[in-house]
Amino acid sequence: MQGIAVSGLAPSESSRYTFLMKPLPHDGPALLGPDDPPTFEVINREGGAHILLVCDHASREVPKSLNHLGLGAEAFERHIAYDIGAAAVTRGLVERLDAQAVLAGYSRLVIDVNRPPGHPESIVPENDSIPVPGNQNLTDEARRQRVRELFEPYHDSVNRALARLWNRGPAPAIFSVHSFSPYFGDKSRPWDIGVLWNRDPRIAIPLMEHL
């Protein structure tokens, strides 16, 4: 059984449809090919709620050029590849709240869009004691390519969604939807749901009081 974690942030066109987009081409060989899925998905762009849902670890896709990062199919059934169930929860919240959502299109094993470029956990050589061959001994250019073709388009889309909401009214609420495994190493995670925040509790505290 997976748990669901929601992070709430309060930052200082009217039909329901989905946008699927890929990054613009650039000089040099591309990471993504014509048969690869989009880098992100925008759902319900014109949603009426003043809420943005983001799902950083929605997908377990890997660009075909990376040959599954040298991993077997079983690795992509596990939580190391994506947040199991988080995309479905995000889509359900879109329907219930009439909110906009942006979902990342590629596995956290390729690049973790929830970490800044250069962070030790951005592109990991191993995850949960499982080596990731396709992430080992990468050149600086190979790392930049993943940032350029996967990380930046996703975050640009999130920024555009925020700009649309800012232009419509007061500061929007942002919720980042994740899931977590019952165990992390040998430590139990017995909770069904978690609410996380950093310095601003204005959304998190009332949300927990109503759960």
Model-assigned labels for residue ranges:
Residues Y17-I174, S179-L211:
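N-terminal catalytic or cofactor-binding beta/alpha core of small enzyme domains
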Residues M1-L20:
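N-terminal amphipathic/basic-hydrophobic helices that include classical n-h-c signal peptides
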